[in-house]
A protein has these predicted regions:
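Conserved donor-binding/catalytic core segment of Leloir-type glycosyltransferases
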Residues: 7-26, 32-35, 50
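Flexible glycine/serine/alanine-rich "lid" or loop that lines and gates the nucleotide-sugar donor pocket
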Residues: 93-94, 122
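A short acidic/histidine/glycine-rich donor-binding loop in glycosyltransferase catalytic cores
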Residues: 139-148
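A conserved amphipathic alpha-helix that caps or lines the catalytic cleft of carbohydrate-
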Residues: 32-39, 68
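Nucleotide-activated donor-binding/catalytic signature segment of Leloir-type glycosyltransferases, i.e.
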Residues: 53, 61-90, 97
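Nucleotide-sugar-dependent
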Residues: 26, 86-90, 98-119, 128-139
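A charged, aromatic-enriched C-terminal amphipathic alpha-helix characteristic of glycosyltransferases
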Residues: 5, 149-197
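Short donor-sugar binding/catalytic loops of nucleotide-sugar-dependent glycosyltransferases
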Residues: 19-24, 55-56, 83
Length: 197
């Protein structure tokens, strides 16, 4: 997984990225409703949400597309569709903060360890989510959203991100203990076979 190479200038705008085959449990509609509330105040500071991946079904389309249209968020919510390889990496380079699942409570899940959160950290991005994930809940680069139907507090997210001092490399290094190599080392040691080295 490539690490984010550049720190973008976030003094005037912030670019959020959510990568998924979008289902209702991703709760991206909560972020869009948060953006609607944010933009009602006519802020100078601009926040953009880049959704990478398809909207998986009618339910997701009905939750997301009208929320964008009715709140005139077309300039701020960008639907990229599925992207892979270099095109996906380019979007991650442009991003400043990542969006994990904000609606796992909708499917009755309170605790989950998603691969997406791990990918975001491995790429060196700070991120948000609403479920419980023991590996990240107290990480200094994670801004936890409540596990409910409230619109995401965009100003709170912006303030968190702007106060963040960790570099992409520091974020990536924090997840080394979660890597396959580190996890398999534990298994091999427990089984009494020495080490992977």
């Amino acid at each position: 997984i490539p690490i984010k190479r550049t720190m973008n200038d976030t003094s005037r705008e912030l670019h959020l990225i959510g990568v998924a085959e979008v289902h209702y449990w991703h709760g991206f509609d909560r972020l869009i409703h948060g953006l609607a509330e944010y933009y009602r105040t006519n802020p100078e500071y601009k926040v953009y949400f880049h959704i990478v991946g398809p909207l998986s079904g009618i339910r997701e389309q009905e939750e997301i597309l009208p929320a964008i249209r009715d709140n005139h968020l077309e300039p701020y919510v960008i639907l990229h569709g599925p992207l892979h390889s270099d095109k996906l990496d380019e979007q991650f380079e442009k991003a400043d903060f990542a969006i994990g699942s904000l609606g796992r409570h909708r499917s009755g899940i309170a605790h989950i360890k998603t691969l997406k959160n791990r990918e975001y950290a491995a790429r060196g991005l700070a991120f948000t989510y609403s479920e419980n994930d023991d590996d990240f809940d107290s990480a200094p680069y994670v801004w936890k959203a409540p596990a409910d139907e409230s619109p995401v507090d965009i100003m709170g997210l912006v303030e968190f991100q702007r106060a963040l001092t960790m570099t992409p490399l520091e974020i990536r290094e924090s997840v080394y203990p979660l890597s396959w190599k580190a996890q398999m080392q534990k298994v091999i040691k427990e089984a009494g076979f020495g080490s992977l080295e």
